[in-house]
């Protein structure tokens, strides 16, 4: 844990590219009592927003980027 935000961004974009279109509306994160789908997370992460960074940290915390 604790990877830098650019590394997390790159990992998320790699994961996102492999998610089938039909699953991209599925919720993947809950941040500040709001839910975020793959698509809404992509918009924030790709736009390099503060919210996107916060979502990436949450996804790392729940183990989305674990290898193996």
What is the role of each PLM region?
Residues 1, 13, 48-49:
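Short secondary-structure boundary micro-motifs
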Residues 13-44:
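Short amphipathic alpha-helical interface segments
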């Amino acid at each position: 844990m604790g990877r830098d935000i650019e590394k997390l961004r790159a990992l998320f974009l790699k994961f996102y590219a492999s998610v089938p279109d039909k699953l991209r509306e599925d919720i993947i994160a809950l941040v500040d009592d709001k839910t975020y789908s793959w698509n809404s997370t992509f918009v924030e992460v790709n736009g390099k927003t503060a919210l996107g960074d916060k979502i990436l940290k949450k996804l790392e915390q729940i183990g989305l980027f674990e290898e193996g």
